[in-house]
């Protein structure tokens, strides 16, 4: 059975190990985080501290954008964009990784403490009963402080999250 995680699209470009799990994983990605990939690719600000790493991550972002723009995948994503909280059909990446895109809606429910994409991650996690996977330790801290009823894992704990019985 596949483990499900809620994640921003850029995490897949930054953390290559997420594309090579030891068992089947499904990543649910809010559509707005896919749109953010275009901004990150076009932006002049570095994403990573090291120039070499930054170039590699920007290349991976380009590959993700190309994947999402492939005709067949684009049609699947467009099916999710017809109604709030609708998910795309599965977009297989490899034998162990499947992506699904969700048209998450920021209801401003957590706008005081979280930005719009973080709010979409939270609401998607609640709706899907799946943990958030992030590299933003401050996000995890704010989730705890605000007593948001979701589970979140740091990317560094990815293998533990995949292996354990951690569904919300």
How would you label these PLM feature ranges?
Residues 4-128, 137-145, 151-152, 156-162:
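Active-site-proximal, substrate-binding regions of enzyme catalytic domains
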Residues 132-133:
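Conserved SAM-binding loop
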Residues 163-168:
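A charged, well-structured terminal subsegment
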């Amino acid at each position: 059975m596949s483990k499900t995680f809620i994640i921003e699209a850029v995490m897949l470009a930054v953390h290559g190990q997420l594309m090579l799990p030891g068992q089947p994983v499904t990543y649910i990605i809010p559509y707005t985080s896919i749109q953010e990939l275009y901004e990150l690719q076009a932006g002049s600000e570095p994403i990573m501290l090291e120039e070499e790493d930054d170039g590699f991550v920007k290349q991976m972002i380009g590959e993700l954008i190309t994947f999402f723009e492939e005709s067949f995948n684009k049609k699947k994503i467009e099916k999710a964009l017809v109604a709030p909280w609708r998910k795309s059909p599965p977009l297989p990446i490899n034998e162990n990784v499947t992506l699904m895109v969700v048209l998450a809606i920021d209801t401003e429910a957590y706008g005081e403490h979280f930005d719009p994409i973080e709010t979409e991650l939270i609401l998607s996690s609640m709706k899907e009963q799946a943990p958030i996977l992030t590299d933003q330790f401050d996000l995890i801290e704010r989730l705890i402080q605000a007593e948001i009823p979701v589970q979140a894992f740091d990317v560094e704990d990815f293998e533990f999250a995949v292996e354990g019985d951690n569904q919300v």
